[in-house]
């Protein structure tokens, strides 16, 4: 029984508390549901997958006349893909490969499997398979620490954190922030196992710097009343990338979502603590997104300064810039696209932020052009391109500038999610493609010689991607003026040939109208 407790994460049977609370006999009263089903807050498509991994909830639902999910009980074979018992045909989608990248493998089947392991729920399966015990409890109430390889993900119980003597400076991820005895638990520490995981020690790639001083304590932190503060709620520790850049910040959110899968818990009754060793605050232009993951404000670590803090349950989340991680440092096999993970992430965030689809519209294709008010990568003949689009009666054209002071992030998401063709210059704003509808296309008007960034992100999300194809028909204002590197294509502005632009947009429209999820199956000769 004790071993089952220790390896609960690995066996995928012990979720974080807060989501799945057993009902009492008093709850069995007639007219009252046996479970708080509204607390799940999951898209309808995700419910059978949740029930597959939470059979106790499925059992309650089967006996409960108030359960709204009875129709999903017939689909309990459905699984995300990382579960040991998951048959491939029941996975939450599978990648599609159009050709074999011989630099990686030699068959379509192996290419599909490789892509699934690189960037889909197969990535979660590999992390789950790596988890081992670093600090072993002697009894169920003792502390514990289990981690994946390189300490990219860890889960602790009875965690002791002593912040009475720490020293802060300008460094957000100070590696010697904690000393021996200032972090630990009452459990049997395998110090060799801990030290052996330091090969990828780096601020946004590993938790090794924070946990290398984990100490086997000679007292039980909570039972022996050694804590100034006891945090009862499950707590996620996160080291965050740049909060002012959507591409980088959504690496944080995607990895938090993946961590929830590893924990088999999607509860929002949790705390999120930003691990930051500096005295600074954190500028966050996308803070509304946290509402998809927690009911509370994000807590800065310095909130606990000068205190001994104990956490009953703590998770050290997967990180945004892990080597071979998701999605900043992801090496991807070519020729494959469409991960269930990124589609599920998109659905999850949109559902919890209450962003709804108001279309598509019969006889219309909704085209959104993302303008830039920054100094570089402006579309110099934007008005000319917009006027050309408006000559096509099928197109419903909108020009937006996603400036956070003028348009809140939730309003930005509503526009993006209700777009069929999304057009923009190379830049972090194209990360919005994550929240386009499945049938949509994204047109990176010019990639500024950074060919893979948004092409790969579109492949991960499963969104059709096009970009400018004829160098002779794009006209830079000059050769670019990088502040230190000199000439650089990202540091200038561009004009575009109107005829070539329209040709590419019409190609994108044809994809939208022919997509299997486009509901209006008519001829579109007007294009």
UniProtKB/Swiss-Prot annotation:
Entry EC no(s): 2.4.1.255
> Tissue-wise, where is it found?
Widely expressed. Expressed in brain, heart, kidney, lung, skeletal muscles and thymus. Highest expression is observed in lung and the lowest in skeletal muscles.
GO molecular function annotations of the record: protein O-acetylglucosaminyltransferase activity
- Keyword set, alphabetical order: Endoplasmic reticulum, Glycoprotein, Glycosyltransferase, Signal, Transferase
Q: Which reaction does it catalyse?
A: L-seryl-[protein] + UDP-N-acetyl-alpha-D-glucosamine = 3-O-(N-acetyl-beta-D-glucosaminyl)-L-seryl-[protein] + UDP + H(+); L-threonyl-[protein] + UDP-N-acetyl-alpha-D-glucosamine = 3-O-(N-acetyl-beta-D-glucosaminyl)-L-threonyl-[protein] + UDP + H(+)
Glycosylated residues: list them.
Answer: 354
Disulphide-bridged cysteine pairs: none
Instruction: Indicate which residues form the motif Prevents secretion from ER.
Output: 524-527
> Where in the cell?
Endoplasmic reticulum lumen
GO biological process annotation, one example: protein O-linked glycosylation
What top-level class of enzyme does the UniProt entry assign?
Answer: transferase
Q: Where is the signal peptide?
A: 1-19
| Claim: Ligase is one of the keywords in the record | no
Gene Ontology cellular component terms for the protein in this record: endoplasmic reticulum lumen
Which residue numbers does the motif Required for optimal activity cover? 295-297
The main location is: endoplasmic reticulum
The similarity comment for this entry is:
Belongs to the glycosyltransferase 61 family.
What PANTHER family does the record point to?
EGF DOMAIN-SPECIFIC O-LINKED N-ACETYLGLUCOSAMINE TRANSFERASE (PTHR20961:SF148), GLYCOSYLTRANSFERASE (PTHR20961)
The protein's job, in short, is:
Catalyzes the transfer of a single N-acetylglucosamine from UDP-GlcNAc to a serine or threonine residue in extracellular proteins resulting in their modification with a beta-linked N-acetylglucosamine (O-GlcNAc). Specifically glycosylates the Thr residue located between the fifth and sixth conserved cysteines of folded EGF-like domains.
Protein name in UniProt = EGF domain-specific O-linked N-acetylglucosamine transferase
Q: Which organism is it from?
A: Mus musculus
